[in-house]
């Protein structure tokens, strides 16, 4: 009787079964942080879009460690986070079967990008979504109904959540449908939460009002899709010896004769990637303001530091590959992040209470790399490149063409 001589742990985890494509593209938040009434009312989640990665140089703050007060280089991910718009409020009551929604209140005006989310084909539709909800704000009966709904929230509801959508038009994507999600309000009493939700209807919320510097957050999203993959790539099983008949990247024995079926615990080929996952404990290194105007001047230097005073934007030279420019507010987190470029990532406040020194460490950035990510970039800004390369031939040709055009225009004017 043949059998294995040695035992070994199984390859891969079965905790994520079934390994199939996610049913949703946007990361779903299945749990919110525990409420604390002593804190002011605040949102617990935000929507961001993955732009790309770069690296930073910072000074380590680890007393007792060999690298304390020394410079360390770390990889970071940049997520573009344009302001979100609050368009509704939902009140939940506690039942023996869990939370159940009691009342919904929608804002009077919903943007086109938000209403597009509720249609499969916007151009063939009648575009009448939320017309009844908006009419409530104009007639007397509707206003009474809205006031009654808010009174129900105050009297019966234990959990208040707001409905907010991203502003997809502010980022350089072809998509026109905004992403809509429910976000739980934490902090304060129920009266404070209802008041906050009512005051912020149709108003933008900045990411800086939700998260803070050096905060630990969670990233919820869908991983990068890999398609149909073999068992070795999908489960990281051991390759068979070189002389094995009919392939090496296989499982040699997929089970016993009886029971006469393949067990669900056996590694098999199939879908890899595009799975819904939650990554916890991502530290925020910087929350940067987008390109804005202040005192009549356009402010772009959101990648400069106290040590690097260069006037530069977080967008690297040539833009982030397969994404482009980051012109809105952004969040820079340590390390990598799930998903491909342009993938929507739901950022959530951490569910845990952090006590580790690495989580409480204060981050002081010295340098943010903005060189080209298409290759081995050498220059941080176009000014650096111009100073090193000198005047280029194409620039000289443009100047000559402009001079020729100006001379021809002057000659025409003189002759006339």
Swiss-Prot record:
Keywords: Cytoplasm, Ribonucleoprotein, Ribosomal protein. Pfam families: Ribosomal_L3. One of its GO terms (biological process) is cytoplasmic translation. The keyword Ligase does not apply. Gene3D superfamilies: 3.30.1430.10, Ribosomal protein L3, domain 3, Translation factors. It comes from the Eukaryota. GO terms for molecular function: RNA binding; structural constituent of ribosome. The keyword Metal-binding does not apply. InterPro entries: L3_arc_euk, Ribosomal_L3_dom_3_arc_sf, Ribosomal_uL3, Ribosomal_uL3_CS, Transl_B-barrel_sf. It is found in: Cytoplasm. GO terms for cellular component: cytosolic large ribosomal subunit; cytosolic ribosome. Its main location: cytoplasm. Belongs to the universal ribosomal protein uL3 family. The L3 protein is a component of the large subunit of cytoplasmic ribosomes. This is Large ribosomal subunit protein uL3. It comes from Drosophila melanogaster (Fruit fly).
């Amino acid at each position: 009787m043949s059998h294995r001589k040695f035992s070994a742990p199984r390859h891969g985890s079965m905790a994520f079964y079934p390994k199939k494509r996610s049913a949703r593209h946007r990361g779903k938040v299945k749990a919110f942080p525990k409420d604390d009434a002593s804190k002011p009312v605040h949102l617990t989640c935000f929507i961001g879009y993955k732009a790309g990665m770069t690296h930073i140089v910072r000074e380590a703050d680890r007393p007792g460690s060999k690298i304390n007060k020394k410079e360390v280089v770390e990889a970071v991910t940049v997520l573009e986070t344009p302001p979100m718009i609050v368009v509704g409020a939902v009140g939940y009551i506690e039942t023996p079967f869990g939370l159940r929604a009691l009342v919904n209140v929608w804002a009077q005006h919903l943007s086109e990008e938000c209403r597009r989310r509720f249609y499969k084909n916007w151009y063939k539709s009648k575009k009448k979504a939320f017309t009844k909800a908006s009419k409530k704000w104009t007639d007397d009966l509707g206003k009474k109904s809205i006031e009654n709904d808010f009174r129900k929230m105050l009297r019966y509801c234990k959990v208040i959540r707001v409905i907010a959508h991203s502003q997809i038009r502010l980022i350089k994507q072809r998509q026109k449908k905004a992403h809509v999600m429910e976000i739980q309000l934490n902090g304060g009493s129920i009266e404070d939460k209802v008041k906050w939700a009512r005051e912020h209807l149709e108003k933008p919320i900045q990411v800086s009002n939700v998260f803070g510097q050096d905060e630990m957050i969670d990233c919820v999203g869908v991983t990068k899709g890999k398609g149909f993959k073999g068992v070795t790539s999908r489960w990281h099983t051991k390759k068979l010896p070189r002389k094995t008949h009919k392939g090496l990247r296989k499982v040699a024995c997929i089970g016993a004769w009886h029971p006469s079926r393949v067990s669900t615990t056996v590694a098999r080929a199939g879908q890899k990637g595009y799975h819904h996952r939650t990554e916890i404990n991502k530290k925020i290194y910087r929350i940067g303001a987008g390109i804005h105007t202040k005192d009549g001047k356009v402010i772009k230097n959101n990648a400069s530091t106290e040590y690097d005073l260069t006037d530069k934007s977080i967008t690297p030279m040539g833009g982030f590959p397969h994404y482009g420019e980051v012109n809105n507010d952004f969040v820079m987190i340590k390390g990598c992040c799930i998903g491909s470029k342009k993938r929507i990532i739901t950022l959530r406040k951490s569910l845990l209470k952090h006590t580790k020194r690495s989580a409480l460490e204060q981050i002081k950035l010295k340098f943010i790399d903005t060189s080209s990510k298409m290759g081995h970039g050498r220059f941080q800004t176009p000014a650096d490149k111009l100073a090193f390369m000198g005047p280029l031939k194409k620039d000289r040709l443009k100047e000559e063409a402009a001079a020729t055009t100006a001379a021809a225009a002057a000659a025409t004017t003189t002759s006339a």
